Every structure is written in C-alpha cells, then in structure tokens.
Amino acid sequence: MSLVVSQQAVTSQRLNAELINKLQTLIQFKSVTPNQAGAIDWLVMQLCELGFCCEKFTSSGVTNLIAHIKFNEGPCVAFSGHIDVVPADNGDWLTPPFDGRIINGVIYGRGAADMKGGVAAMLTATKKLINSTSSKAGTFYWLITSDEEGEAEFGSAQIANKLSSNGIVLDGCIVGEPTSSTHVGDTIKNGRRGALSARILVKGRAGHVAYPQNTINAAHISAKIVNKLSEQAWHLDDAGSKTTLQVTGINIDNVVDNLVPSHCEITFNIRYSHRYSSEKIKSILNNSLDEFSRYITINWERPCEPYYTQPKSKWSLITCVEQAIHSQTGNYPVLSTSGGTSDGRFFANSHTQVIECGLRNNTIHQVNEHVSIDDLIKVEAIYYDLLSRIYIER
C-alpha cells in the first residue's frame, strides 16, 4: 500500500469517527419539539468554526438558525434540517433513547434517522467541503429549526420569511429528511403532496326512534356524506402524485339506543396532488356536499400547500442529486412525492428547486429508532459528492 493511499485511509477513518461522534452528540440533546436543548447552540459553534456567519433567533419558544458562507459568485443553495424530535420514554428501548449507544454497528436513539443522522452527515460533508483546497463558487446556507415535528408555525416558515425580507433568493434547497426505503439513496422527494383536514358538524333533530317521522337523523345524513367523500373523483391527479381522502372519525354523543341523534361530527384528512391548491380542494368538496348544506357546517384545519420540483434545463438540483447518488451507489434514485408533509414546502417556489434526500425511514418515530453506521457513512458520502458538484469549480 502506497503512503498516499495509507494516509487517505487514515483520514477517512478519522472523519468517519467524527461523523459517528457528531450523531451521538446530537442524540444526547433531549430536543423534544420545540425545545432545542442545546443542539442548535452546539451547531452554531460547529459552523462558526468552519467560517459560517450564524444568526440564531427565537419565535414563540422555537429556536431557529440561519448560517451562511460565501465563496465566489455562484449558486445559492441551502441545507434545511431540524434537530427536534418526537417524544420517547425508556419503555421497550434496547438502550435509553437519548444515549446514542452503538450495538452491533447500529446507532440507537431518538432522532437517529429523523433527522439528526442527516444533520450529522451534512455537517461532516460541509467540513470536507470547507477543507477542500479546490476553488469554490456559490453561497451555502444552513437553515435549522426546532419546530418541524410540531405545528411548524414558528420554525422553517419564519426562516423563509426572514430570508425573503432580506432579499435572499435560493436557487436550491436540500432537505435532509429520511427519504430512502430499502437502501440509502434509492428514493428522493422532488415534491410533497398538500394536506388539509376538516371537521363537518352535522345538525339534525333528535327524537324517539319509534317516531322517525318527527326526527332528522344526523347519523343517516353523515353516512351519506361519508359515502360522497369516499367516492370523490380527482381528475387532475397524475401518476406520481395521487390525491387521497381518508375519513378519520365519525363521532356521535349519544348514550342511549332509543334516541335519534341530533348531532354528528365527521373528521377527514386529504393528501392532495400538486395539481391542486388548498382553496381548490375546498371549492370542490363544498360543491360536492352542497346538497347537505342546510345540515352541515365545515371547519377547515391545518392547510399545508404542496410543492413540486421539475428538472431544469440550465442548473438542475435534481440532476446534481441523481448524479451524486449514482456516483456513490451505482444506482439512480426513484423520484417520489409520497409520504407526509415536510418543511420543504416553505422554501419551494417558482425559482427555488427543493429536493429531499436522506437516510432510510424504516424506524422513524418508533421505539428503537436507529441508523446503521454503514448507512450514515453512505449518506455522508452522497452529501459530500452533492456539495462538490454544486460548489467546487470544475
């Protein structure tokens, strides 16, 4: 083995050890939404050491970070991530959920996959980029929040607003969500469906079940409404982005069996194609349920608009991500818009291309959430390859 190859191997081992240590450190911050628990403070220290300008700000108890470093003139691209996690009690965990312990080459801990693993991998890739002696062009932003797993009102939405008010326009945004399925890099998100919830209050007239002619049965009306909702057609869908409507509750406050119910509440959630907007969805369903209008009141809740990124003819973030993944894995990823909503929606617009790319999502939010060290190293390699394609002048 030559001296150069030997030195490269030693450097690689050292960086891999740093990567593992970074993830363990992040896991040990008990940053349950919206508490950053010191995780963002630690990131500020790490990024400042790499030469980033860092701005930390709070909004309604949420901590956010905007950090950037400017090279020569070139593309303006961001990494968007979150350090908050869903709750975890010791319960059935193999190890305490905030220890970051390694068992048989696997790192266990809340947030290991969603998404502290992605943050640790991008931090290591960022350090490699900064330390590279190659000429670089562009501006690199880090956009981190402690409010992604909750209502997401005061996290990335506020970061996007602050960027806009400062006249900062991103060419691209890489979101480090765990998008992979069977193998790291097998799936990336080039969009997300929108989401919209609703409550329908159905009002009838109560009475004795033996005299139905004197009543208006709210349950019977509700059954017809549920049937109407379940049969709704969505003509604008395309193959890669399907709209689905799921009834999530039918509730009647009735404690006896001889009383026709006067009220019923129906709840439902729609995950809708990027071909629609929330206002279009509301209009379609209001028209569909118009025949029941004298009996119902609809309250719409928690709208999340969809986004969709297509390949561009000039500079294309999709192409950069696809090439980085192919270079590191030998395969091209599947493009998908499936799954839940993400913070990508806050940064996507007609100019900003948003792509989500990260670890496997098979254990997220579960007891014994984990990531293998091999997967962690692989996603870091993809990230560094991607950053090199974006920033290193060729």
Sequence positions of predicted segments:
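Active-site metal-coordination/substrate-binding segment of hydrolases
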Residues: C76-Y141
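Metal-dependent amide/peptide-bond hydrolase catalytic core
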Residues: L3, R14, P178-H183, N190, ...
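Fold-level recognition of mixed alpha/beta catalytic cores in primary-metabolism enzymes, strongest
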Residues: I107, G117-T126, I130-K228, N368-K378
